[in-house]
């Protein structure tokens, strides 16, 4: 059963890799939104359409350049941290219709794996899917963000564009050492709450 956010077209990639390690890559992609076979087999006996789910998962991973895994049926626990996060990103990108929230997607990863996840974020972004990236890693934020919402004392304190400010400026605004700039002009139709 889908959550209210998922039903609204919003997908999330969590810092703690919200995947089931013992399940396959394909099963994790469809966790909570399984496809059933047509006819009586699916409607009455609730038989899963494993082939359709595997084919879809394989295509989504291929689209994002992630088919370096041995098999779409291998257990997620056999993957590296970066590959696991890649599966989570692919799942979010496959089912999001509005935007993807990524909560510290590189926090538990090494340099090489973080690089791959940042490339995936850029790929998803290029495909036209908006991304809300929550991160304390300023180099990563500045690399992939179009706009940066800086929070201070649990409130939005400023919105900056990475091309207009340095990482040091962002940290200074965050800590209160620098006054926040006046609001930037947002694209037409954009709403900020």
Kindly give the residue locations of the regions a language model identified.
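Glycine-rich phosphate-binding loops of nucleotide-dependent enzymes
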Residues: 1-193
């Amino acid at each position: 059963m889908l959550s209210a956010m998922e039903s609204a077209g919003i997908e999330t990639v969590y810092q703690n890799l919200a995947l089931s390690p013992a399940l396959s890559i394909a099963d994790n992609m469809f966790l909570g939104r399984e496809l059933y076979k047509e006819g009586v087999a699916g409607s009455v006996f609730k038989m899963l359409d494993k082939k359709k789910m595997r084919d879809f998962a394989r295509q989504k991973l291929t689209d994002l350049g992630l088919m370096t895994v041995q098999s779409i049926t291998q257990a997620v626990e056999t993957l590296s941290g970066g590959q696991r996060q890649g599966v989570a990103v692919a799942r979010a990108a496959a089912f999001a219709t509005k935007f993807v929230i990524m909560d510290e997607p590189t926090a538990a990863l090494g340099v090489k794996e973080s690089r791959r996840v940042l490339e995936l974020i850029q790929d998803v972004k290029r495909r036209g899917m908006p991304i809300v990236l929550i991160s304390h890693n300023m180099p990563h934020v500045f690399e992939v963000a179009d706009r940066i919402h800086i929070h201070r004392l649990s409130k939005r304190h400023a919105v900056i564009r990475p091309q207009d400010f340095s990482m040091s400026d962002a940290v200074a605004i965050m800590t209160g050492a620098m006054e926040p700039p006046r609001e930037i002009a947002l694209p037409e139709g954009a709403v900020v709450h």
